[in-house]
Amino acid sequence: MNKKNLTICSFCGRSEKDVEKLIAGPSVYICDYCIKLCSGILDKKPTSTPSSGTPTETTPQHSDLQVLTPKEIKKHIDKYVVGQERAKKTIAVAVYNHYKRIRALLNNKHVSYGKSNVLLLGPTGSGKTLIAKTLAKILDVPFTIADATTLTEAGYVGEDVENIVLRLLQAADYNVARAERGIIYIDEIDKIGRTTANVSITRDVSGEGVQQALLKIIEGTTANVPPKGGRKHPNQEYIRVNTENILFIVGGAFVNLDKIIAKRLGKTTIGFSDDLGDFSQEDRDHLLTKVETEDLIAFGMIPEFVGRFNCIVNCEELSLDELVAILTEPTNAIVKQYIELFSEENVKLIFEKDALYAIAKKAKLAKTGARALGMILENLLRDLMFEIPSDPTVEAIRIQEDTILENKAPVIIRRTPEAIA
């Protein structure tokens, strides 16, 4: 046969004599060797390139999406978050339903229920952010935190809401499919209420605009995300991210929301003080468990925004016992961390029980909840951490109550000369 009359593969140039099969298409041919090669390439999962900001398009399968039961979710949260039993149970159920919904969608099943976005109420340092972080760690999904006070509506100087999605995409190493089932936590959400007290009229207007802008990505939209962040401009390339299955958790202190609830319920009919300013913390926590959509609207959130959160739960102010437990019980408890740091220097760090309660009392007075604990301990132990590495005679350090309350020096136990030798 004349070589010129032989049919060849359009990709590799092999002739029909050199291959087992040659499949014809419109004016083209492909051999079995090239088909196998292409099949192998398609079977490989694409790798992301975060440094260049190039998105990957891997489609997630149900097999790599963890869907733990509510009890399992709460059990994991308990390892890191002290107290907040009601909040942890409520969130565990909401998160379970959310990811169960995603798994059903991945399996091409019809789903009639919507996503379970969560709104967390509660004072600073009550564990709102920690709960969200822990959830992301448990579920092994991308996670990012945003501050609502830095966001602005279009036309204002500040950060566009799409940049929140960009940060989630970056947390997912630009894997779009992973980002599309991640978790976004927006803190200080109460600060963008349109009628909140002590805020300028300009900020109220801007706050409502931010709520409107957030509404779109929270309810589910295809966001055009600038790969490098910043403001959008014409002729710019975008990464398209569908936010329909991203779990949004928002949190805020919502100061004085309890008074709005009391006014709705009728303060004299629910067993509280006649003076709205006289509520104890226990009263406030109890009132916040009765929050309704109308209370949040009265606070300054727009109805459409509140309507996107079908799970609204209160994180209570931490008690003295809970603050002590936070110091010592969680897997990553801060006292455990300092004990380990000192043990690296071959020094035993001992906290007496009264000292732990003194630290908790000091944190309580700071009005910032668990956040104050780390600062108190850092200030307490900083000088010791400076001196200890240069002093091999120190065997143990005992922190007592008067060390905290009266600024007395901790008890230092020294090694004998023989032990040092």
UniProtKB/Swiss-Prot annotation:
Zn(2+) binds at residues 9, 12, 31, 34. Belongs to the ClpX chaperone family. It comes from Chlamydia caviae (strain ATCC VR-813 / DSM 19441 / 03DC25 / GPIC) (Chlamydophila caviae). ATP-dependent specificity component of the Clp protease. It directs the protease to specific substrates. Can perform chaperone functions in the absence of ClpP. PANTHER family: ATP-DEPENDENT CLP PROTEASE ATP-BINDING SUBUNIT CLPX-LIKE, MITOCHONDRIAL (PTHR48102:SF7), ATP-DEPENDENT CLP PROTEASE ATP-BINDING SUBUNIT CLPX-LIKE, MITOCHONDRIAL-RELATED (PTHR48102). Pfam families: AAA_2, ClpB_D2-small, zf-C4_ClpX. The lineage of its organism: Bacteria, Pseudomonadati, Chlamydiota, Chlamydiia, Chlamydiales. Keywords: ATP-binding, Chaperone, Metal-binding, Nucleotide-binding, Zinc. GO terms for molecular function: ATP binding; ATP hydrolysis activity; ATP-dependent protein folding chaperone; protein dimerization activity; unfolded protein binding; zinc ion binding. Residues 1-50 form the ClpX-type ZB domain. GO terms for biological process: cell division; proteolysis involved in protein catabolic process. This is ATP-dependent Clp protease ATP-binding subunit ClpX. The gene is clpX. Component of the ClpX-ClpP complex. Forms a hexameric ring that, in the presence of ATP, binds to fourteen ClpP subunits assembled into a disk-like structure with a central cavity, resembling the structure of eukaryotic proteasomes. ATP binds at residues 123-130. GO terms for cellular component: HslUV protease complex.
